[in-house]
Amino acid sequence: MQQIQLPQGMKDTILQECEKKKYLQNTLEQIFESFGYEEIITPTIEYYETYENAFKNIQTTDMYKFFDENGRILTLRTDMTVPIARVCASKFKDSKPPFRYRYTSNVFKVRQKFAGKRSEVTDCGIELIGLHSKSDVQVLCCALEVMKNFKNYTLEIGNVQFFQAACKVVRLSTEEINTLADLIDKKSMVDLKIYLDSLYLSEKIVDFFMHLPFLCGDVNILDKAYAYCFDESLKEVLDSMKECIQSLNELGCLENVTIDLGKVAHLDYYTGIIFEGYVSGVGTSILSGGRYDCLLKKFGRDLPACGFSVKLDPLIDHVDVQLKKKFILYYPESKQIEAMKQANTLRKEGSVILEPSLNETIYVKEVE
C-alpha cells in the first residue's frame, strides 16, 4: 500500500480544485502586474547556507535537507523572500532600485505529525525593494486589492517596532525579549505578569507590556495606545502608523482594516509594519507580510524592503469562480468527422468530450 500513499503533509490537487486554484492564481497575478510587479522564478532547491545566512535563529527541523554530489547541504525553499533577496543582490547588483518583483511558487516546510498542516503550499506574492516605510501604504493597498476577492475578510496591521522600542528603552537582553514576545504572542497573562515581576521593572513599564496583547481592534485603538507610551520612541511608532492609516483612509482602502499592536512574531526578521489577512471560514491567516529592512544587507545590498505572500491552497473553496462548461458529444462511428466539426464549434463555449454511441444521431449533453 505504501507506493500509492503520499508522504506526510502532502496532498494531491485534482480536477475542479485545479481549475479554482489556477483561476485564483491568475486573478492575483493580474493584480500584482497591474501594480507594476514583474515576475521572478527561482529554483526549488537552494543551498542551506543561503537560509542560514538570512535567519539568525533558523528552525532546521522545519526544512527538507539533503546533500549534493560535493557534500554541500541543499534544502527545498521554505519561502520566496530569501531567494528573491539572493537574486536581487546578485542578478541586479548593478541595477538601480526600487525593484518590484512578483512570484508564484511552491514552498516546503516539514510539519509535525497530526499537525493538520500541509508540507507543500503554493505562495503567490510580491516584494517591493528599495523604498522606505513611507511606501508601506503601497504594499498595503495591493494586499487589500487581493483581499477584496473574498467575502468577510479582515486585514490586521501591527508594527514590531512598538514592542522593540519598548525593549530597547528598558535594555532587555535578547533572551528576555524572546521570552516576553512568546508570552505576549500566546496571551499567557498570568505567566507574563510573573515574568515581568521577575525583571523588576517600573509599574508604568509593566503596565505597558500587560496591556500590549489587548491593544487590538479598529483603527481608533491607536489613540488609546498613546496612554501606555512611557518613551517618546513609542509615540513615534504610533505617529507613523497613524500616518499610514490616514493615507489608506484618503485612498478609500480602510474598510475591513483592524489594528493589533500585540503582533510580535518573527522579531529577527521584521523591522516595522507587519500584517495578516483573514477570510471567514479559513482557520488561519491566508496573507502575511511586513517590512524587513535588514535582510538584503545579509546578501551584500543594504536595501529596505516590504512585501507579502498569499497562501493559495486554503482559499480554493472560498473563491467564486465560474467554471467552464463541459459537454459530452455522443456520435455514431459513421458520423465521427461531422461530430468533430460540431465539437470544434462547441469548444467556444467550453470543453467537449467525444464519446462513441450506438445511437444513429449526434447529440450533446452538458455535464453538471
What role is predicted for each listed range?
Residues 144-149, 163-171:
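Hydrophobic mid-domain F-helix/FG-region of cytochrome P450s
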Residues 62-68, 171-194, 201, 279:
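Acidic, His- and aromatic-enriched active-site or binding-groove loops in soluble protein domains
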Residues 17-35, 46-49, 81-93, 101-150, ...:
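Positively charged, Gly/Ser-enriched RNA/tRNA-binding surfaces
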Residues 41, 75, 154-156, 258, ...:
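Structured core elements
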Residues 42-61, 158-168, 263-272:
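Beta-rich nucleic-acid/ligand-interaction surfaces
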Residues 1-82, 90, 148:
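TRNA-binding/sensing appendages of the translation machinery
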Residues 4, 51-55, 168, 320, ...:
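Short secondary-structure transition/capping segments
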